From Swiss-Prot:
This is G2/mitotic-specific cyclin-2. GO terms for biological process: cell division; mitotic cell cycle phase transition. GO terms for molecular function: cyclin-dependent protein serine/threonine kinase regulator activity. Essential for the control of the cell cycle at the G2/M (mitosis) transition. Keywords: Cell cycle, Cell division, Cyclin, Mitosis. SUPFAM superfamilies: Cyclin-like. Interacts with the CDC2 protein kinase to form a serine/threonine kinase holoenzyme complex also known as maturation promoting factor (MPF). The cyclin subunit imparts substrate specificity to the complex. Belongs to the cyclin family. Cyclin AB subfamily. Only expressed in organs with dividing cells. It comes from the Eukaryota.
Length: 328
């Protein structure tokens, strides 16, 4: 069995979870979210067009881990440095033996691997970020692309996880296409190429904050992460900064769940994006949602179509966002 990489990509059946396994969904390290708007104190931070903006941090005043005193400064800093982790949206043009379809196959597969290893959500975002930043600086032959993905996930695990998959597990899941020496050599090359810089904000960092601003319940949270996971696979989404991708995912999720356009002043204030600024990215996400279960790259759809993720993939896409696509 071969594919566009020239190497076998497989996930061992023993590592797969049954799609209907009733395992509860948890997202690690998310900020406290509230399904009841009454739980969040209404504090008028700024009156824009007569609409109240909620102080989304008042409920965490007694939670030292929420660092309420610094949270706004932290996110202002994240917005300032997020572009350092972005790559050219045309970097694949410089690759001699790769194309964007191969990247999509790799990321789709890694999303399944990430799920089977039950890793934290931020690990996936960092994995894809490391892949893109590495490929933007280093030419890679297609038979080594899967190795790049495995090593990126290994590094992301070492940075984010408490328990890290052992190298032998990675070798096994790649059907022994690579040796331990291959993995360790690629790990060294990747770290040197990236100058050991692994602490740049990904879309996940912004998702936590923006979901809190949206007062997201579990359903909205799952739909937003479903949409942003779909976006990870798509090379064309590299033209958007992580904060915009996160904001668009929350906006599109709100539209998907409610059935109408929904972006209030609290969301606009805390994301610093207006609805108009999100529409281009949001419409792309709706398109990804429409085709999620079709074609060969269905890893995200299978993941979110399981009981573990509350069958989120079965929700109807917000197609009404596409209706005014060609209008000014």
């Amino acid at each position: 069995n071969s594919n566009e990489f020239g190497n076998f990509i497989a996930i061992d059946d023993e590592l797969k979870l049954p799609e209907d396994q009733p395992e509860p969904m948890t997202l690690e390290h998310t900020e406290p979210m509230h399904s009841d708007p009454l739980e969040m104190e209404e504090v008028e931070m700024e009156d824009i067009e007569g609409e109240m903006i909620l102080d989304i941090d008042s409920c965490d005043a007694n939670n030292s881990l929420a660092v309420v005193e610094y949270i706004e400064d932290l996110h202002a800093y994240y917005r300032k440095i997020e572009y350092l982790g972005c790559v050219s949206p045309t970097y694949m043009d410089e690759q001699l033996d790769l194309n964007e379809r191969m990247r999509a196959i790799l990321v789709d597969w890694l999303i399944e691997v990430h799920d089977k290893f039950d890793l934290m959500q931020e690990t996936l975002f960092l994995t894809v970020n490391l892949i893109d930043r590495f490929l933007a600086k280093q030419n890679v032959v297609r038979k080594k692309l899967q190795l790049v993905g495995l090593v990126a996930m290994l590094l992301a695990c070492k940075y984010e996880e408490v328990s890290v998959p052992v190298v032998s597990d990675l070798i096994h899941i790649a059907d022994r296409a690579y040796t331990r020496k291959d993995i360790l050599e690629m790990e060294k090359l990747m770290l040197n190429t990236l100058q050991y810089n692994m602490s740049l904000p990904t879309a996940y960092v912004f998702m936590r904050r923006f979901l809190k601003a949206a007062q997201a319940d579990k359903k909205l949270e799952l739909v937003a992460f479903f949409l942003v996971d779909l976006s990870l696979v798509e090379y064309e989404m590299l033209k958007f900064p992580p904060s915009l991708v996160a904001a668009a995912a929350v906006y599109t999720a709100q539209c998907t769940v409610s059935g109408f356009k929904h972006w209030n002043k609290t969301c606009e204030w805390h994301t610093n994006y207006s609805e108009d600024q999100l529409l281009e990215c949001s419409m792309l996400m709706v398109g990804f949602h429409q085709k999620a279960g079709a074609g060969k790259l269905t890893g995200v759809h299978r993941k979110y179509g399981s009981a573990k993720f509350s069958f989120t993939a079965k929700c109807e896409p917000a197609c009404f966002l596409l209706e005014n696509k060609n209008q000014p």
